[in-house]
């Protein structure tokens, strides 16, 4: 009831009382977990209700008291993880709803509490990543919906939390890529959908974080290419989907981000040309797709950006660049769409 009515002081008092050494041995772990996970008549736990109702004071009180409570009563990481993984009656994770609905303030409270919980309760990397990948009953991740719906604040909170989490658990570059490219039931990634729908706030948030991700998690060129292309499960790039949907700002942002960060990522002239000549499963490049669909402005943008990068990176004499440049210019002289090669 205290949680239900938002009485943070009472909640804190109860949790702190359960943490007193006098309670140790009086309550079994099973009974303690029963108290912590007490549900209302609809099957919602107190933590689920507090988070769902955006009661930041109650949630903060619970999370602040949890490390001592777990230590006093010798709760193991699986029990703490189970408590944090509060679900509704349809087994949808509470953090799924937080991310899907764009409640960045609540997500930040939970993620800020994780480093201490990792240290004191020994949460594993797999458990922490599972919280970040919180899903609904059908297996759709909340982060995916946040990206699809343009909730850039959710993306920003997660990206900003990753370095501090990495200090506690061994999060690798591949773990981060896997998290950021998590897929829906339709096997599309959130970034793919953000590009398709033109959610510039999400895309800019992602690309602005790339230097930090690169330096913190030692990303390699392969990791970076995955994020720039944002492929779905059919290896169809989000960049190409953006072209199909005339999202010129998205296309420009992707190529500018590549231009801005290529040196940091150690991209060579060949790497840059690989990206420019990357083909969808249907065997056409981004430029060819734009031209075939009659999006001449986007096609010209792609050519102009390539020319600028060739000058900036000093590979204007590269045979691949010269051949591609000539091919693009020849196509653009044609009055009607050209069948892609």
What is each model feature region?
Residues 15-21, 26-34, 63-70, 75-82, ...:
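Ankyrin repeat domain, specifically the short helix-to-loop turn at the C-terminus of the second helix
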Residues 39-40, 87-89, 135-136, 181-184, ...:
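Ankyrin repeat boundary/linker residues
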Residues 333, 337-341:
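Non-Sec secretion/translocation targeting segments of pathogen effectors
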Residues 10, 58, 105-106, 153-154, ...:
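Conserved ankyrin/ankyrin-like repeat signature
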């Amino acid at each position: 009831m205290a949680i239900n009515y938002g009485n943070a002081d009472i909640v804190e008092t109860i949790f702190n009382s359960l943490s007193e050494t006098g309670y140790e041995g009086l309550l079994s772990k099973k009974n303690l977990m029963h108290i912590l996970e007490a549900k209302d008549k609809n099957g919602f736990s107190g933590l689920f209700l507090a988070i769902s109702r955006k009661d930041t004071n109650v949630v903060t009180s619970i999370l602040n008291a949890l490390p001592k409570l777990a230590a006093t009563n010798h709760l193991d990481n699986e029990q703490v993880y189970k408590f944090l993984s509060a679900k509704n009656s349809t087994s949808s994770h509470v953090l799924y709803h937080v991310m899907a609905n764009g409640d960045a303030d609540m997500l930040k409270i939970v993620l800020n509490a994780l480093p201490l919980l990792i240290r004191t309760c020994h949460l594993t990397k797999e458990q922490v990543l599972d919280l970040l990948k919180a899903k609904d009953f059908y297996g759709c991740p909340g982060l995916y919906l946040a990206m699809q719906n343009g909730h850039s604040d959710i993306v920003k909170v997660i990206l900003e939390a990753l370095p501090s989490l990495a200090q506690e658990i061994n999060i690798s570059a591949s773990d981060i890529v896997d998290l950021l490219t998590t897929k829906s039931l339709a096997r599309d990634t959130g970034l793919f959908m953000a590009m398709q729908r033109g959610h510039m706030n999400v895309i800019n948030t992602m690309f602005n974080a790339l230097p930090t991700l690169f330096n913190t998690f030692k990303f390699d060129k392969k990791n970076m290419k995955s994020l720039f292309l944002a492929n779905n499960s059919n290896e169809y790039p989000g960049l190409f989907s953006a072209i199909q949907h005339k999202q010129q700002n998205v296309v420009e942002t992707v190529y500018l981000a590549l231009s801005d960060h290529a040196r940091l990522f150690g991209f060579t002239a060949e790497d840059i040309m690989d990206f420019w000549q990357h083909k969808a499963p249907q065997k056409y490049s981004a430029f060819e797709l734009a031209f075939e669909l009659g999006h001449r402005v986007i096609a010209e943008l792609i050519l102009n950006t390539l020319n600028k990068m060739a000058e900036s990176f000093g590979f204007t004499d590269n045979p691949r660049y010269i051949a591609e440049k000539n091919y693009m210019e020849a196509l653009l002289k044609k009055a009607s769409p050209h069948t892609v090669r």
